[in-house]
Regions:
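Extracellular, repeat-based ectodomains that mediate carbohydrate processing or recognition
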Residues: 1-278
């Protein structure tokens, strides 16, 4: 936009906003639709990072500055990246950038905001051995992150035993009512232990007040719930079993999984010879 003197300044991008010491950080983003872009992100992929911290920042779109949850300026985006890590020194210097600095592995699922523009986070704490996944609801109350344990989600949800052990069955916050959270949990029912969708209702201070079974006694898993914004179809997800196969390692495994009716996630393996499947 031209300034008061009808002059236009052009700045070229894109800019790298944050740089982590970890490998393959994961991030989730959302906008309040007015003046802020919220995002939460990890040190790296939980497979590679133990511990794996979870951070929160927002972009002020008027000043184009990166800020922490209290509004403190961390950097001007055009001037360079803000560097994060998982040391004690970093935690002491930038405490308001941290949602969680656990002793194990965090992963982020969603960023939302309540009616007062306070950020709300869906997150998972994964044990060091990756065999236990705990769902948490984290909400900024103006002073601190209130982290509420929702449920244990077992381990990885898919049917491949020794691959992608940090893949949880999934959770999602309703952006229209951030006190409602939907989680996929292993539940014992008529068909044995199957992943079902459970709704958690929390109060304004982040305490669970009730739960409700959305699916029950299913024959196959219900995983990866997701709220469709601005739609009459509010909640969707995946149904059935799933296998993860690395391309180039097991064409036979792919054919076997397909023959069993399993949806297959094809994971490309770098540096390995790939075989043509069809």
């Amino acid at each position: 936009m031209p300034d008061q003197n009808d002059q236009v300044a052009v700045e070229w991008g894109p800019y790298q906003i944050v740089q982590s010491t970890g490998a393959r950080p994961y991030a989730k983003y959302m906008s309040n639709g007015k003046d802020k872009i919220y995002f939460a992100y990890t040190t790296g992929h939980p497979d590679n990072e133990n511990p794996n911290f979870l951070y929160f920042n927002y972009i002020d779109i008027h000043s184009l500055q990166l800020k922490d949850v209290k509004g403190n300026t961390l950097s001007t985006i055009a001037d360079g990246t803000f560097k994060v890590n998982k040391t004690d020194d970093y935690a002491r210097q930038y405490p308001s950038t941290l949602i969680d600095n656990p002793s194990a592995r965090d992963w982020v699922w969603q960023v939302a905001s309540d009616e007062n523009d306070n950020p709300v986070i869906a997150m998972v704490r994964i044990s060091s051995d990756k065999n236990s996944h705990d769902y948490y609801y984290a909400k900024w109350n103006g002073h601190e992150w209130k982290k509420t344990f929702l449920a244990n989600a077992g381990g990885h949800f898919h049917q491949t035993p020794n691959s992608e052990k940090c893949y949880s069955a999934g959770m999602t916050i309703d952006p229209a009512n951030t006190n409602h959270v939907y989680c996929s949990l292993p539940v014992e029912g008529k068909q044995g232990k199957v992943y079902e969708i459970v709704k958690f209702i929390l109060n304004e201070v982040g305490e669970v007040v009730s739960t409700e079974a959305v699916t029950q006694d299913s024959q196959q898993n219900n995983v990866r719930p997701y709220i469709v914004p601005n739609s009459k179809i509010r909640l969707c997800g995946s149904h059935g079993c799933m296998a993860i196969i690395t391309i180039g390692l097991s064409v036979h495994g792919i054919r076997k999984a397909i023959a069993q009716g399993l949806p297959v996630i094809l994971k490309v393996s770098r540096g390995r010879r790939r075989k043509r499947l069809l």
